[in-house]
Amino acid sequence: MSSSSSSLDDEDTFKILVATDIHLGFMEKDAVRGNDSFVAFDEILRLAQDNEVDFLLLGGDLFHDNKPSRRTLHICLEQLRKYCMGDRPIEFEVLSDQSVNFGYSKFPWVNYQDNNLNISLPVFSVHGNHDDPTGADALCALDILSSAGLVNHFGRATSVEKIDISPVLLQKGHSKIALYGLGSIPDERLYRMFVNKQVMMLRPREDESSWFNLFVIHQNRSKHGPTNYIPEQFLDEFLDLVIWGHEHECKIAPTRNEQQLFYVSQPGSSVATSLSPGEAEKKHVGLLRIKGKKMNMQKIPLQTVRQFFIEDLVLSDYPDIFNPDNPRVTQEIETFCIEKVEAMLDTAERERLGNPRQPDKPLIRLRVDYTGGFEPFNTLRFSQKFVDRTANPKDIIHFFRHKEQKDKKDSITINFGKIDSKPLLEGTTLRVEDLVKEYFKTAEKNVQLSLLTERGMGEAVQEFVDKEEKDALEELVKFQLEKTQRFLKERHIDAEEEKIDEEVRKFRETRKTNTNEEDEEVREAIQRARTHRSQAPDVEMSDEDDDALLRKVSLSDDEDVRASMPARGRGRGRARGGRGQSTTTRGTSRRGRGSASADQPSSGRATKATGKNMSILDAFKPSSRQPTARNVAKKTYSEDIEDDDSDLEEVSFTPSSVIESRRTSSTSTSYSRKSTQPQSQATKAHFFDDDDDEEDFDPFKKSGPSRRGRR
C-alpha cells in the first residue's frame, strides 16, 4: 500500500475488503483442483489482515454446498480463527439495535463485542443460493460460523409475505454507514414481491442524508427469464453503492445506474466453478474506502487463482482447411485443436505470475462448433495428451452444434439445441426445473399432466436435487391428490370418470392461475417432507419396541398388516425369535405378525398406509369403506419453518409488534418507513475511478460536477 493512500486512512475512513462467491469446498475431492477454493480464501483473509481493514464484507456463497463436508467446515474454521482472532482494536461501533439485525441468532450481537471473544477482523456476510437456510430449523452453514463467533450473519429474510430490510448502522469517527443486506431468495418470488411492493428498506429517522447507504444482494443480475432476475431499477434510489453477489464474472469497478443514480459493483467469484467465458475474467477483490459520502474502490488482483483460458472454434469458418466430405477431416480437426490447446498453454506459461502458491496447471477449454456436417473426434484419446499439463484434461474439448427445429405434428418438439447452446454462449446454468417446464410446454396433449402442476413439480424436483429432500416429490403428489379429493367431495360430483376428469382439469387450471396458492401448496408439501424426516428415528427398533407396536395395531386383513409394518422394524430383517430359533416355529407364536386383537382401534400407521394407495374414484365410494381418508386429511403438521431458497415454508419469528417496540426503543436505532424521495446532488456519494491498480491514488479528491450529475 502506497504512502499517499496510507496517509489518507484517518480515523474517519472506513476500510472494507469486499469479496463474493468464494465457494469453499468446490470439487474438494478432485486430486488437482480440490484445494483451489481454500487457497483463494486464505489469500482473501490475508489481504484483509495486511491492509488492516475495518471488516471483511462477503456477498454470499461462502460455501459451495448447502451441506458442506466436515473437511470443508474444518478448513474454514481454521482459516477464520487464524486471521480473525487477535488483539487489534476495532475502531468502529454499531449504533443500530442488534437484536433486530441478528435476532434470529442465539447471540444477537456482533462478535467483536462478545466479552468471551477476541476478534481483530470482523466478517459480515449474507447467505447465497448455495449455502441458504434449509431443513427443519431453517439453518445454514453460516449459522454454524455465527454460533462459533467467527462470522456476523446478517440480511436474512424471515417472512415470505413481506420483507423489511433493517440496516446495520456503523460509525467510525464522523463517517456513518447504513449496511443493508438481503440473502438469496428465489428470483421469481423476490421479483413478485418487489412488484407487489412487499420489500421495504428501512432508513434512520435522524440525519438521513448523512448516512452512506451500502446494500449487499445475492441474486441474478443478468436476465435469465421474464422474472428470473432482479432489475436494478427495483432497488431504492437512496442507495449509494450496491455490492452484487451471485454473478461470477468480475466487474468490480463500480458502474453507475443512470436511472437510479447509484453505483453497482460486481466482485465476481474467487474460484472458477464452471468453464464459461465469464469465469475466464481475471479475479479480483475490492478494497473499499468510505469517508462521509465519498467512496473509492481499489481493485486487488488475486494471485493464487488457477489460470483459465477459453476459446471458441467454429469449423464452418475455415472452409479452406476443413471439408466435411474429406475422409480425413476428423484427423485434421483433431490436429488443429491440438495446436489451439498448445497455444493456450504457451500463453498460460507466459502470463504466470511466478507466485509459488499459484497452481501450475491451468484450466483450458476449447469449444468446438461442428455444425455443417462435421463429426466430433474421440475426446478421451485427445485428453490423454494433456493429462500432466492441464487441470481439466477430461473436458478440455467441448463439442456442440446448432440443431434445426423440425415441425412434426405427431411428435414432441423440444428445441434441445437451443437449450444446449444457451449456457455455452451466455455462461448460464441449465436447471432441472427449467427442463421440466420446457418439456410440458411442448409435450403432446396425451402426455400432459392432468392433476399435478408443472410449477409444483419443478419446485419439488429442485428440492430433491439441490437440498436432498428425498420425500419432496412423494409429499407433493400426496398433498395435491388430497386437495383434489377434497375439492371433488365438496362439489358432490357423481362417481363417473368423465365428469371427474373434467372437474379435475378445471380445478387444476384454477390453481395454475393462482400463483400464491400454488406456492403455499408447495411449501406445505415440502414442510411435510421435512417434518417427516425430522421425526424419523435414527436407530432401528428393538424386538420389545416392535412387539409393543404390534399390540397397538388392529387391521382387518393380512394385506393391511403387511402394508402397515415399518420397513426398519427389525435389525437386518431378523424375525422376532432368537437367532437360533428353528424356522418351523417362526411366525407361529401367539404374538406373531398379524395376530393383533381385533377389538383394538386401528393405529396411525395403518391409516396412513391405506390412505396412501387410495385413488380418486375410491374417494367417492361409500364412506363406510374408507374411514382412513378423513384421518389423513386431519393430520396436522408444524408450520414454524421457512426455507428462503425454495419458496416452500414459513418461519415463525419475533412478532412484528415486538420488533417495532425494539426499533423505537432508542432514538439512534429508529427507522423510517416513508417512501424515499429523490436526493439532491450534495447527499449522494461521490465515486472516483481507479484506472491503474498499481498507481498511487487519492480516494478523496474532489470531482467535477459532471461526475455525478443529477436529474
UniProtKB/Swiss-Prot annotation:
Residue stretches of biased makeup (Low complexity): 656-676
Taxonomy, superkingdom: Eukaryota
Predominant cellular place of this UniProt entry's protein: nucleus
Record's keyword terms, sorted: Chromosome, DNA damage, DNA repair, Endonuclease, Exonuclease, Hydrolase, Manganese, Meiosis, Metal-binding, Nuclease, Nucleus, Telomere
InterPro entries reported in the protein's UniProt record: Calcineurin-like_PHP_ApaH, Metallo-depent_PP-like, Mre11, Mre11_capping_dom, Mre11_DNA-bd, Mre11_N
GO CC field: chromosome, telomeric region; Mre11 complex; replication fork; site of double-strand break
Acidic residues bias locations: 639-650
Residues bound to Mn(2+) 2: 61, 129, 218, 246
Short motif (GAR): ranges: 570-593
Record-level GO BP terms: DNA damage response; DNA strand resection involved in replication fork processing; double-strand break repair via homologous recombination; double-strand break repair via nonhomologous end joining; meiotic DNA double-strand break formation; metaphase chromosome alignment; mitochondrial double-strand break repair via homologous recombination; mitotic G2 DNA damage checkpoint signaling
Active site: 130 (proton donor)
Family: Belongs to the MRE11/RAD32 family.
Subunit structure: Component of the MRN complex composed of two heterodimers rad50 and mre11 associated with a single nbn.
Function of the molecule: Core component of the MRN complex, which plays a central role in double-strand break (DSB) repair, DNA recombination, maintenance of telomere integrity and meiosis. The MRN complex is involved in the repair of DNA double-strand breaks (DSBs) via homologous recombination (HR), an error-free mechanism which primarily occurs during S and G2 phases. The complex (1) mediates the end resection of damaged DNA, which generates proper single-stranded DNA, a key initial steps in HR, and is (2) required for the recruitment of other repair factors and efficient activation of ATM and ATR upon DNA damage.
Protein name, UniProt field: Double-strand break repair protein MRE11
Organism: Xenopus laevis
